[in-house]
Structures are given as C-alpha cells and as structure tokens.
Design a protein with these regions (language model features):
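Multi-pass membrane catalytic core of lipid/isoprenoid biosynthesis enzymes
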Residues: 45-71, 84, 103
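Cytosolic, membrane-interface loops and tails of multi-pass inner-membrane proteins
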Residues: 20-52, 107, 199-217
Length: 217
C-alpha cells in the first residue's frame, strides 16, 4: 500500500505541467507548437531560454517536492524503505508528467522530472556525472535527445553501483532489487518516449537544438 500511495503522490505532482502552464500564460499552447511535447526542450525551442529554464526548474522541483512529501509521510515509520519509497514517488512524477490525464495523456518525456529524482535520491557525485555527461554530449552533438538518453542510462548504472556499495543504506536486499527495477523501468520509458528521436538519430535526420525558432539540421 505504501508503494501505491507514493506513486499516487508522485503522479499528482507530475500533473503540474510547467511548460504547458507557462506557455498558456504567454498565449502559447506547446501541444500545438514545435514537437508538440510539453517538456523543457520544446519550451526552449519554441519560446526561448527563459521558458526553457522555468520549465526545467519546475519539472525538476516537482519531483523533489514529491520526495519531500513522501519523507514527511513515511520518514519516521518506514526508515529502511525510504530510498525505495522515494523512487516510487519519483516514478509517479515521471508518469504524471508523461501521461497527464487532463491533457489527454499527452505530456513530456520525463527527463527533467528524472533529473529531479536523481538530485533528491542520489549523491552529489552522481548528479555531477549526469550533468557533465549531458552538457558534454549536447555541446558536442547538439542532440538533446542523445544527452537525455545518456543520462537515464548513467542513472541506471549509478543506482546499481551505488546500491551495491551500500550508498542507499538499505538492509533489505529485496528493496534494492526493486530500486534497480524502477531505475530500469525509467530508462526503458525514457527510450520509449524518445523512439521517434532514435529513428531520426539512426537516419541522420534528428533535429539539433536551437532556441526560439526552427531547429537546425
């Protein structure tokens, strides 16, 4: 039951579509612009740096907020489960972000929300590794999609390595295995949401990042 509650808490926070709300406030419906995606990259491409920054921070923060709420609910009674429950909350946020019911289940791709999960459940070194990898790949290739998929892959590997070395301070091995399963699910989901990007990357037609206008080839 605790797991389900955490997923539901996360899903509610995930429903806060930062990019969509910011766009509506400024007379732009992200679902009808650019890629039609309600996430950070489309906000950046369609409305510029400010919109991209606001969307990124908002989508990251909602995951951090969900984890904080879960800690408030279960922190004193489920100490050994907290890393696991935090990940369930993060998974719920990603699901809410990707599949918001009030937008006909058409949301973002969950990368910024996953970044919030990385920030709130791992350590500074994993955060820095993911950040540096993302910046390096986007700076050299200008493919945000490639950087995003690299980050979720690094996240999965990091969760397993961190967990196997006692980083989560979880005594129940079954909890660790669940955490690895959640990280695997999030990686697979991210790749699924980027399936069109993967096809374009393989064919050499993927759009390169640009701001406030048309993507460059």
């Amino acid at each position: 039951m605790e797991r389900l509650i955490c997923v539901l808490v996360g899903y509610v926070f995930g429903l806060i579509q930062t990019g969509y709300l910011y766009g509506k406030k400024n007379g732009v419906d992200l679902r009808k612009k650019g890629s039609g995606n309600a996430g950070t990259t489309n906000a950046l491409r369609t409305m510029g740096w400010k919109a991209g920054g606001v969307t990124l921070l908002g989508d990251c923060f909602k995951c951090v907020a969900a984890v904080v709420v879960v800690h408030m609910i279960y922190g004193k009674t489920h100490t050994d489960m907290m890393p696991l429950l935090s990940m369930y909350a993060g998974m719920g946020v990603v699901l809410g972000h990707n599949y918001p019911f009030y937008l006909k289940f058409k949301g973002g791709k969950g990368i910024a929300a996953t970044a919030g999960l990385i920030i709130s459940t791992t350590n500074i070194w994993i955060v820095l590794i993911c950040l540096v990898a993302f910046i390096a790949i986007v700076a050299t290739t200008r493919y945000v999609s490639l950087g995003s998929m690299t980050v979720v892959t690094i996240y999965l590997i990091s969760v397993i390595v961190y967990g196997q070395h006692g980083g989560f301070h979880v005594e129940n091995v079954a909890y660790l295995h669940e955490m690895y399963g959640i990280a695997t699910f999030l990686m697979i989901l991210a790749f699924w949401r980027h399936r069109a990007n993967i096809k374009r990357l393989l064919s050499g037609t993927e759009n390169k990042i640009s701001v406030g206008g048309k993507d460059k080839k």
